[in-house]
Every structure is written in structure tokens, then in C-alpha cells.
Amino acid sequence: MSGSHTAIAPLAPCMEGLPPLPKSLSGLLNSSGGSGWRDLERVYAQKSRIQDDLSRGGTSGSVQAHPKPPNLDAALALLRKEMVGLRQLDMSLLCQLYSLYESIQEYKGACQAASSADCTYAMENGFFDEEEEYYQEAGSLHKIGRENSEGTVSPISNEDWILENI
């Protein structure tokens, strides 16, 4: 039991906010990284397909003829079968979820690397020159207009000023 606690510890930091895996799943933690999860997912999917085929072939007539099991033993056997199927489905979904989590983390890292690389590439190669020139020209025109309105008297007479503003 103490081995399962040590096996859970390495995954805890990378899966923050999620509860720890149950002890019954500690065997999955011993697999090596994401490829182990993907391999386990394939194995469980194949195993569940085989068991589904076997259960359909062996009991196809008896299950459909008797929807309710005739006695307690048959009911327990049916319940066991359903529990095994649900456990396999649960494991398969867990593997898919972890695989998806890993893929999302890889995608986030790739996006962050690409965005930081694009930003430095754009700054180095001057992709923003046209916008900067436009804003510099507008700023200089605004600056000139302010200088004239702040205190310098323009040499235009009142009549010329009225004609220009009409």
C-alpha cells in the first residue's frame, strides 16, 4: 500500500486541481509516460471488444428470452458482467482523458513557443513599420498643431483666417 502512495506523488504536480487516483488504479501509474496510457487505452478497448463479442455469442438466446434473471445467482452473474464492463469503460475513459490532458499541455506549450517566437520574429524583421510610421506622422502633426495653438500667433490676417475656415 505504501508503494501506491509513492507512485501517485509524481503525477500530483502535473495534475493540479484533480483528486488523486484511487489505489485500484495504481498499476496504471507505473507505466512510462503518455505512451503507456495510450497503450493501455488500446489494450482495454481491444479487451472490451473481445468480451463484448464473447458475451453476445454465448448468451444471445438466453438473455433476450429472459430479460430478468430467474434466480439470485443469475442476477449476481449478470451484475458482475455489467460491473466488469463498466470498469473497463471507466479505465478506457480515464486513459482517453489523460491522453487528452497530455495533448492539451503539448498544444499549449507549442502555442506559447510559437507566439513568443512570432513576436520576436516580427520585432526583429520590422513587420510593424507601417503602423509605427502612421502613428509617428499623426503624432507629429498633432504636435505641430498644439505648438501653433499654444502661444505662437500665426501670420495670417483675420480676413484670411475667416476665408480658410469657410
Swiss-Prot record:
Top-level taxon of origin = Eukaryota
Question: Which family does the similarity line name?
Answer: Belongs to the FAM89 family.
Query: Per its record, how is this protein called by name?
Result: Protein FAM89A
Q: Which organism is it from?
A: Xenopus laevis (African clawed frog)
